[in-house]
A protein has these predicted regions:
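A hydrophobic alpha-helical transmembrane-helix feature that marks the membrane cores
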Residues: 1-201
Length: 201
């Protein structure tokens, strides 16, 4: 529920920013400077606040979560400005793809191992390092395409892994923190969206 609600809120936030012509961070994709760093710091800071706040503080945790989603929408807003048609098409594509991966996980859960976690984390660190290098020494468009393609593959496996993790937690009936439990799949979807958008441009 929170995964779907998060996507709806982000899409609504982007539409709201566009409707009221809110100044965006469009130039962060061209002039990579303090604005990008500032946006990333706010996003990470809010995410940490959401994760660390106990679920018993229901209202406060939801306010932080909604604020984080709104900031994510603002960070994604420049993509809608770059090409609104591709942005809308990618939304449908990613939601369909995530639904497919979810069905695969439920159909063949034994094919997905929770031992993947360490390997996936190591590959994610490599991807982040590659992105950081590109921040200071821009890659060619072909290299960007290859990196985005690799990221889609990586986060597809993350999606399978995180969905399996949700299934296992649900079966164990552990104390639920629905927002935190949904963050893995939600972030997988966001990363799939960004990288698929760049592949389609």
């Amino acid at each position: 529920l929170y995964i779907l609600l998060g996507f709806i809120l982000i899409a609504s936030a982007v539409d709201l920013y566009s409707h009221y012509n809110i100044p965006s961070l469009y130039n962060i994709y061209k002039n990579r400077g303090t604005r990008l760093l500032f946006a990333l710091l706010i996003t990470i800071g809010l995410l940490i606040a959401v994760i660390t706040m106990p679920p018993k503080f229901l209202i406060g945790k939801h306010i932080l979560w909604i604020s984080w989603v709104a900031v994510l929408g603002y960070v994604l807003y420049p993509l809608a400005q770059l090409n609104r048609r591709i942005f809308e098409q990618t939304k449908i594509l990613v939601l369909s793809y995530m639904a497919l991966l979810t069905m695969i996980t439920f159909k063949w859960p034994h094919k997905i191992s929770l031992t993947w976690g360490r390997t996936l984390l190591m590959l994610l660190m490599v991807l982040i390092l590659v992105r950081i290098v590109g921040f200071f020494r821009p890659y060619t468009s072909q290299t960007h395409f290859m990196i985005s393609y690799a990221a889609v593959v990586l986060f597809s496996f993350f999606m399978l892994y995180d969905t399996k993790l949700l299934i296992v937690k649900a079966k164990k009936c552990v104390k639920a923190d629905y927002i935190n439990d949904s963050l893995g799949v939600f972030l997988d979807g966001m990363n799939l969206f960004v990288n698929m958008f760049h592949l389609r441009r």
